[in-house]
Regions:
Chain B
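Intrinsically disordered regulatory regions flanking bHLH/HLH domains
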Residues: 1-127, 131-152
């Protein structure tokens, strides 16, 4: 047992405190996790009281005979043989810990180092496999040269390799790893952008034919500009329409308006027809519109508009059918003021 | 991504916008000059923007930016609108572009177009742009129907 504890120190004690830490770490872990090893070790250790105790426990279920050898803690635990066996194992580990404490002067820093080693292990996982494999084989060769016992050699190997790797990463600048993570992040970002671009491609009409991100972005920019200008233009048109609109809006409450909008073609036919029917009388009927009681407020401005855009009103028949979108704001104004009266008439007749 | 062109957003925008229109129409114009039309246009434009941004709420950057801009615009309204329209027209110059990569000029152009994406990364900006495009399309659709309805 002591020989095994000493053995790692013998071959790795070349000035680095990592070897001492490694030996202690490996020993503690192994002993705490695997009790049966400790029990086997106790047989090898030559401590006859403990081996006799084991024999007693296994043969006669009572632990009476064990009390002579085991201290008082185990005496209190007389419920079963298994728990007492565990207790002996724990005691054994405590002993070994004391030995470790005596042997390692750097034990105070062990916790800190453990954390460092864990961090280094995490870093190492990201590195390329070839280097690690090479390192690992090297460490294996080293371990085989030393006298490590057979049942713990694999565990020792892994521990040693990790320590060696941590040493390795201290020596080498982590250049490759940095670029690796950067390139990974860059790739993820590019994929994200591609997904978003695809999403946008579906939204923007005519964008699916364009290849390349630059062309697509051009299309998107154009489309957004176009939509913003459309909103501008439509609000301008609404502004031009507005003086005549309040009757309509007052007639149609806002809640019912979407219904009107959805069946717009059917709803719009009647006023349009009435509009066209009234059109020939329009230039000769300023008095007729003036005599309407509710439109008195609007009549002066309407007459002004008629004077200013009289030439437009002659071609109103064609414009009326072609729709508002081809008209300037002023012509639509006059058109609408006339259309409003007609609509007003048809609404109340 | 939530679908902003759903019927609920559309109808809510329509309702808000029409309410704003009624409110604007209550104040009767003193004259029919082009100045008056321009003022009216600006108010309608702001009302449309505000209605859309209010419908979307504060969960999107562009709607937040629009609301903030409208709030800040109360004082320097005219100058800002002039500057914005100039900016849009001034951005017409084409950029020399590579085939497959997004150039900085394009990105900046899009940043100027979509409100509230000034300091975003490209991914979030594209997300915002998609949402903004959908909302703008809805807005245009509704406004066109209103105009069509009133113009007949």
């Amino acid at each position: 047992m002591l020989h095994r504890l000493y053995s790692p120190e013998r071959w790795t004690f070349n000035g680095t405190d990592v070897s001492a830490l490694q030996r202690q770490h490996a020993g503690l872990k192994r002993l705490q996790q695997q009790n049966y090893i400790v029990q086997n070790n106790s047989v090898e250790f030559g401590s006859n009281p403990l081996s006799g105790f084991r024999g007693l426990v296994s043969s006669s279920f009572h632990v009476v005979g064990a009390e002579g050898f085991v201290p008082s803690e185990a005496a209190m635990e007389q419920c079963s043989s298994w728990t007492s066996g565990c207790m002996t194992a724990e005691m054994e580990t405590v002993k070994l810990k004391e030995i470790n404490l005596a042997l390692t002067p750097e034990r105070d820093n062990s916790n800190k180092r453990k954390a460092e080693i864990a961090a280094d292990e995490r870093c190492i996982e990201k590195r390329s496999k070839g280097e690690v494999g090479m390192e690992y084989s090297e460490v294996k060769a080293k371990c085989s040269s030393t006298e490590i016992s057979a049942n713990t050699s694999s565990k020792e190997n892994s521990k040693v390799s990790e320590v060696e790797k941590s040493k390795y990463i201290h020596v080498r600048p982590p250049r490759g790893q940095a670029t690796g993570s950067h390139s990974l992040a860059e790739r993820a970002r590019r994929e994200k952008i591609n997904r978003k671009m695809k999403c946008l491609q579906e939204l923007v009409p005519g964008c699916s034919k364009v290849t390349g991100k630059a062309g697509m972005l051009d299309e998107i920019i154009n489309y957004v500009q176009c939509l913003q200008r459309q909103v501008e233009f439509l609000s301008m048109t609404l502004a031009a329409l507005n003086p005549s609109q309040e009757f309509n809006v007052a007639n149609f409450p806002a809640k019912e308006f979407p219904a009107y909008i959805t069946k717009f073609p059917a709803a719009a036919k009647l006023p349009a027809l009435a509009n066209r029917a009234c059109l020939p009388f329009f230039p000769t009927q300023p008095g007729a519109t003036n005599c309407m009681p509710d439109v008195a407020l609007h009549s002066p401005q309407a007459s002004i508009e008629r004077n200013s855009t009289y030439s437009v009103s002659t071609s109103q028949q064609t414009l009326n059918s072609s729709g508002i979108s081809q008209l300037g704001p002023l012509s639509s104004w006059s058109l609408d003021s006339q259309g409003l009266y007609d609509e007003y008439n048809t609404g109340f007749q | 991504m939530k679908n902003p062109s759903s019927s609920s957003v559309k109808s809510r925008f329509t309702r808000r916008f029409l309410r704003a229109l009624i409110k604007i129409n209550r104040q009767k114009p003193s004259s029919s000059s082009s100045r008056e039309i321009f003022l009216r246009y600006r108010r309608i434009r702001i009302a449309a923007d505000k209605a859309m941004a209010c419908v979307i709420g504060s969960r999107r950057a562009w709607s937040r930016a629009v609301l903030r801009r409208i709030k800040n615009q109360k004082r320097k309204r005219l100058a800002d609108s002039l500057r914005r329209s100039n900016g849009i027209h001034g951005m017409k110059k084409m950029v020399a572009k590579e085939e497959d990569e997004i150039s900085y000029e394009q990105e900046n152009e899009l940043r100027k177009l979509v409100p509230g994406v000034g300091a975003m990364d490209l991914c979030s900006m594209l997300d915002e742009t998609a949402h903004y495009v959908m909302c703008l399309a809805t807005q245009v659709q509704v406004m066109r129907k209103i105009v069509d309805f009133y113009s007949t």
